[in-house]
Amino acid sequence: MRSVITGVAGVGKTTVLDIVSKETGIKIVNYGTLMFDLAKKRGLVENRDQMRKLSRDIQIDLQKNAATEIGRMEDVIVDTHMSIKTPFGYLPGLPEWVLREINASAFIIIEADPELILRRRQNDPTRARDEDSVESIREHQEINRAFAAAYSIFSGATVKIITNEEGKPDKAAHDIIKVIAVD
């Protein structure tokens, strides 16, 4: 079983996934962290901020290698992004070469009310985020749904939307456990 779980920043994904992992014992692998670890081993970077400055070809190579590693793992949840918002538009978080290697059985998107997400982002002093609005958060969540549908068409994996209601991360975690238990 390999499931991909995503959500926009501030949706509460880390909290929910911590509960899922504790209750199931399933390993959570952060795709970006795996890419960073590979780059660091090769001596390409010393910190995560340097990842953005690597050439496109090197980044694609790191993506492929991280995906290959994940593809060898059993019973794992991949924590990543369905789409990445840039000043130029949305980039796919799971390009074709990543989808093929990961071979996920399910794509799960954690969502929350955009107003709640905005409040969480505004109250998080540990992150330097771009200026956001309820509308831009709503748009990003809609884009994530569209990308998930496209990935599903390519891969044959199911798509499930899970709502993380305020103060109810346990409910969202249990909804996820029901989906991944089928695998």
From Swiss-Prot:
The keyword ATP-binding is annotated on this UniProt entry: yes
Pfam entry (one): AAA_17
GO molecular-function term, one example from the UniProt record: adenylate kinase activity
Keyword annotations from UniProtKB, A to Z: ATP-binding, Cytoplasm, Kinase, Nucleotide-binding, Transferase
A single cellular component GO annotation: cytoplasm
Enzyme Commission no: 2.7.4.3
Main location: cytoplasm
Catalytic activity: AMP + ATP = 2 ADP
Binding residue positions for ATP: 7-15
Top-rank EC class of the record's enzyme: transferase
Protein family membership: Belongs to the archaeal adenylate kinase family.
HAMAP family: Adenylate_kinase_AdkA (MF_00234)
Protein name: Adenylate kinase
